[in-house]
Amino acid sequence: MKVVYSDKHQLHDPQFFIVRGKVKRSNEQPERGARLLAAVQRDGHRIITPDDHGAAPRAAVHTPQYLRFLETAYARWRELPDASEEVVANVHPFPGQPCTYPDHIVGLAGYHMGDTACPIGAGTWEAATWSAHCATHAAQLVLDGERAAYALCRPPGHHAYVDRANGFCYLNNAAIAAQHLRTVHRRVAILDLDVHHLSLIHI
């Protein structure tokens, strides 16, 4: 089977995570991608590098505001005095609270980040973008006649919402692949093997 993989995932190296109130190093490390790559290589699968599929596949799933935030958040955050090395939200809007769309990076982080599992570092946007390219490329391989293709996506994407990072995820690769398949096929089935319901499948 063809396995679509980009070493750009190594640019995403999150450090910050909170577990039961304790700050810990994130489990979503570059070593995860390396282990998965080693496993598929050991089983004899063919590794291919994705093409750059442009912005359209992710724009078909995520809002322009959210994509702009992901692309610019790190640089804007680092302009703050005494800022941390990663973007981590510390304030969030809540149901019933009247609010307009924020313009300050602290407010934007709270608006677009659902938890502390998805800090944004210097390489997060590029890594997430190429992860989405992997998903799109694998979907295109199937459209081109492959019976199956595997996208080795890191950072993962299946818990990202249309306008919010969540659960280690930034761009929803499952939804991006499904939307790409829907450019040809009206209906696409998603089989979710995670331990709980993935986000953004009802699009």
Residues of each region from the PLM?
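HDAC/HDAC-like amidohydrolase catalytic core signature
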Residues: 1-191, 196-201
